Amino acid sequence: EQATLIDFGKLNADIVPDKNGGMTQ
């Protein structure tokens, strides 16, 4: 289930980098 969060986080980072503190990968 954690893998989904990581994958989702990466996708979200592209859309909302603010959540990651401005970290776009």
UniProtKB/Swiss-Prot annotation:
Enumerate the UniProt keywords alphabetically: Bacterial flagellum, Periplasm
Gene Ontology, cellular component aspect: periplasmic flagellum
Annotated compartments? Periplasmic flagellum; Periplasm
Plastid as a keyword of this entry, yes or no, is: no
Q: What is its main location?
A: periplasm
Keyword Glycosyltransferase annotated:
no
Function in brief: Component of the outer layer of the flagella.
This protein's assembly is summarised as: The flagellum consists of an outer layer composed of repeating units of FlaA around a core that contains several antigenically related polypeptides.
Protein name in UniProt: Flagellar filament outer layer protein
Q: What species is this protein from?
A: Treponema phagedenis
- Gene behind the chain: flaA
